[in-house]
Amino acid sequence: MTTLATLIFLVTLLFVLWQPKGLDIGITALTGAFIAVITGVVSFSDVFEVTGIVWNATLTFVSVILISLILDKVGLFEWSAIHMLHASKGNGLKMFVYIILLGAIVAAFFANDGAALILTPIVLAMVKNIGFSKRAIFPFIIASGFIADTTSLPLIVSNLVNIISADYFHVGFVRYFSRMIIPNLFSLLASIIVLWLYFRKAIPKTFDDNNIKHPKDAINDLKLFKISWIVLVILLFGYLISEFTKIPVSIFTGIIAFIFLMLARKSNAVNIKQVIKGAPWNIVLFSIGMYIVVFGLRNAGITLILAKILEYISNYGLFSTILGMGFISAFLSSIMNNMPTVLIDAIAIGQSNVHGMLKEGLIYANVIGSDLGPKITPIGSLATLLWLHVLTQKDVKISWGTYFKTGIIITIPVLFITLIGLYLTLIIF
């Protein structure tokens, strides 16, 4: 059973990351799940249990991405980025910091995938338009992709990993926010400092801002642009209401996304069919399929091994517990992707004999490691692989070697500082 469960998991993961001939990750994961079921590695009751765990998370994620795609077509993100350029007043370092801050805001409210895949092309087009050299463009591209994950901690909806973990342990919106806002601020500050130290020689000191277009020129539909702000406010209230009513957050995000789609249908700036097609629907199939495969590892007793390791680490106190869990999840995410990692770790945490604040430390450290760890390698998250593909289409080629060399140097210190932020949060608040 153990060998079979491990083999099914590894082969499924290999095909998910490899994607031969464009094989859809949803189909791959469901195939792995089907094999796991027919071989008896998982039962039909496991299938229903997995569906119960991931349906809210994945539908929330898809809804948020749908909303962000409409906002992108309206021009909200480009409008924001142009404001950042104007605020920089020709100062290269200010522009670098402001772009990072914008990325952090977008990641918080529209998920890491939305920030990386929507904001990066906008930033790339802008720095090219300003006339930056390839050497000067690289820091801005890396920063846009890096910050999308490192600051995707504050809200449950900021990352699919967050939603899945919060759902698994029944953590509400407000409680989650109260525990992760300080680590997110630590991560943001650490990211700015580490990225600046790493790229300081490549970032231009000044740039010509005379030819930058006016922010209003980025708006493709003024009426829908104004409505967008109302939608964002309602979305935030929806998150809060879900906390107190115990109604799944996907219900609120789904209704808001549907209404926004109906309003956008009349806009010439938004191609509804293109927006719906662009949503990551395959993530729903991938999540269900991959987690069924992961449940096979649980049934085979593999997650119990990790649970014992976590119990051992917890004997050394809260600080060691947080650092240990954070770096374990970061390492696992970097070598086998953060999606299966977060659930494997969550199952192990649930199986471990750890309680109280120590268990809370494990839960949130797992999220932090699974959010930040993927930046170490290109295979750490599906968003990174897609991000690299988008850049290649725009004639910006980043080799896996270059990415790894950059990723490991800038991720490790940021991860450590972020975990310190979590530790301080738990002992003070």
UniProtKB/Swiss-Prot annotation:
Q: How does it sit in the membrane?
A: Multi-pass membrane protein
Tell me its family. Belongs to the ArsB family.
Q: Which GO terms describe its molecular function?
A: arsenite transmembrane transporter activity
Give the protein name, as stated in the record: Arsenical pump membrane protein
Major localization class: membrane
- Encoding gene, per UniProt annotation: arsB
Cellular compartment(s): Cell membrane
| Bilayer-crossing regions | 3-23, 25-45, 50-70, 99-119, 137-157, 180-200, 222-242, 244-264, 275-295, 316-336, 372-392, 408-428
Listed GO CC annotations: plasma membrane
Top-level taxon: Bacteria
- What is the role of this chain? Involved in arsenical resistance. Thought to form the channel of an arsenite pump.
Listed Pfam families: ArsB
Query: What are its GO biological-process terms?
Result: response to arsenic-containing substance
Keyword Transport in annotation:
yes
Keywords per UniProt: Arsenical resistance, Cell membrane, Membrane, Transmembrane, Transmembrane helix, Transport
